[in-house]
Amino acid sequence: METLQDIGTNMLKDELRTPYFMIDEAKLIANLEIAKHLKEISGVKMVLALKCFSTWGVFDIIKPYLDGTTSSGPFEVKLGYETFGGETHAYSVGYSEEDVKEVIDICDKMIFNSQSQLAAYRHLVEGKASLGLRINPGVSYAGQDLANPARQFSRLGVQADHIDESVFDSINGVMFHMNCENKDVDAFIGLLDAISERFGRYLDKLDWVSLGGGVFFTWPGYDVEKLGAALKAFAERHAVQLYLEPGEAIITKTTDLVVTVVDIVENGMKTAIVDSATEAHRLDTLIYKEPASVLEASDKGQHEYVIGSCSCLAGDQFCVAKFDEPLQVGQKLHILDSAGYTMVKLNWFNGLKMPSVYCERKNGQIQKINQFGYEDFKRTLSLWSIE
């Protein structure tokens, strides 16, 4: 396996063709140091949520700080096992028997989403991996209903009033994934207390509890000490090993999507068209209607533009931003905080060029992680032609 030391060394930023993602090693390590401290004061273990960030080319930076990976599908399980190591947790909203057989020999924990799946496949897991079940506690913290695991008619986890209490005698652990971008430590502690009160007598029978992801402990001003104390108290109260499954918390504010202005048009408002698209390269901007932020923008700027994509989707735009000076064709812009749920969702809509991926090392060296070309685009559409 190639490493960062083997490929793409000694590159200069000015030579890089847009669009591309630039991962900043120093910023990544700053987040990881916070994670390390939280682990030390709380005793919690952390597994990286690959659904959020799977760019394995930088896993050598992350591995010394975390305990392994957690996955939402069989290919993520394999990727975590092969490229990260440590503990490999396997979870899926819906397993097939083939899926279970495919990963059971390489995972340490297998977590089922329902009691029916647990009953159907537990015989394949017992003796090979620690057995877990996802519980939906009916409480959550999420800014948008689309990402709320406790939303009405949720399919995520076993509803509290549907649990067969005997199940806790034959599993090793449970997962409660109930947060999305939770920056409020008191709100999280409130969720912890609710879980302890409602499920405590069951948790006392278990070996481990995963509290999922979505806890934004690296957000500026977050009270990590308070979080650590609450996690430690919970683990001691129920005599369990606690896990967190951070994704965004690890890679937030580490990565820019760098684009170039290719045209400027006007239809009631100026639009700077860039060589990228939210539909293809930053999908959550479109899905959640959360405008991106641009490094070069200024709140007090006098020149306002829509930062529009080059896709054919009429509403595909990154944001509206103000600038101190008029934008120029050929100018580069940095779309900030573009690591989480971006590279894992890249697609070939419109046949647009896929962004390359680079890492800026602590010493300033630029190293290539990935690049894509026409053959990659063609291969995703067909490998064979009908006869």
From Swiss-Prot:
This protein's UniProt keywords: Cytoplasm, Decarboxylase, Lyase, Polyamine biosynthesis, Pyridoxal phosphate, Spermidine biosynthesis
InterPro entries in alphabetical order: Ala_racemase/Decarboxylase_C, Nsp_de-COase, PLP-binding_barrel
Leading EC class: lyase
Record-listed E.C. numbers: 4.1.1.96
Modified residues (N6-(pyridoxal phosphate)lysine): K51
Traits of the deletion mutant: Abolishes sym-norspermidine and spermidine accumulation and results in substantially increased accumulation of diaminopropane, whereas putrescine levels remain unaffected. Disappearance of norspermidine and accumulation of carboxynorspermidine. 50-60% reduction in growth rate of planktonic cells and severely reduced biofilm formation, which can be rescued by exogenously supplied sym-norspermidine but not spermidine. Not required for colonizing the small intestine in infant mouse model of infection.
GO terms under biological process: lysine biosynthetic process via diaminopimelate; nor-spermidine biosynthetic process; single-species biofilm formation; spermidine biosynthetic process
GO cellular component: cytoplasm
Localization (cell): Cytoplasm
Cofactor: pyridoxal 5'-phosphate
S-S pairs: none
Reactions it catalyzes: carboxynorspermidine + H(+) = norspermidine + CO2; carboxyspermidine + H(+) = spermidine + CO2
Main location as per UniProt: cytoplasm
A GO MF term: protein homodimerization activity
Binding-site residues for substrate, renumbered to this chain: E248, D284
Function: Catalyzes the decarboxylation of carboxynorspermidine and carboxyspermidine. Essential for biofilm formation.
Family: Belongs to the Orn/Lys/Arg decarboxylase class-II family. NspC subfamily.
Binding partners and assembly: Homodimer.
Name of the featured protein: Carboxynorspermidine/carboxyspermidine decarboxylase
Species assigned in the record: Vibrio cholerae serotype O1 (strain ATCC 39315 / El Tor Inaba N16961)
